[in-house]
């Protein structure tokens, strides 16, 4: 029983850390990375289609993304979708290849992005703490039903706290890497 609760809590905490990593990939750091455009969809045959399904996105160099569109007629739509996104990018089309130069980030914009990233990390920590609260509640319920002893309850809560500490530490490490990336000029 307790092992199942701990395993479930650990899996949910790991998913929270992964979700944070995925959210932070979408934050522009001034360095070209294909995941920067992962949230963009294109209207294709009447359906919203993710950009990576209608084009190949690669980092040409540290400041330029190259998008090779599979269907020539889509180039204009892809270009428009990138301009309409709130990323502040200006794509340049040359046939089936669209180049997206990334302008350097201003100091003010970097600081704003750091605030956003810290907020995302705090949301991740809150999610992990909520998972801890749920797991501890499940353990307390077992204690109340007299399925486990008070010693088992205390031990389980200590182990759940260790899982929580590890997840929060992981979140802090991810945050530190992203902040460093953002503040590099």
UniProtKB/Swiss-Prot annotation:
Signal peptide: none
Keyword terms, alphabetized: Cytoplasm, Protein biosynthesis
Gene Ontology molecular function: any one: ribosomal large subunit binding
Principal cellular location given in the protein's record: cytoplasm
Compartments reported by the entry: Cytoplasm
Domain of life: Bacteria
Family named by the database record: Belongs to the RRF family.
Function: Responsible for the release of ribosomes from messenger RNA at the termination of protein biosynthesis. May increase the efficiency of translation by recycling ribosomes from one round of translation to another.
Protein name in UniProt: Ribosome-recycling factor
Lineage: Bacteria, Pseudomonadati, Pseudomonadota, Gammaproteobacteria, Vibrionales
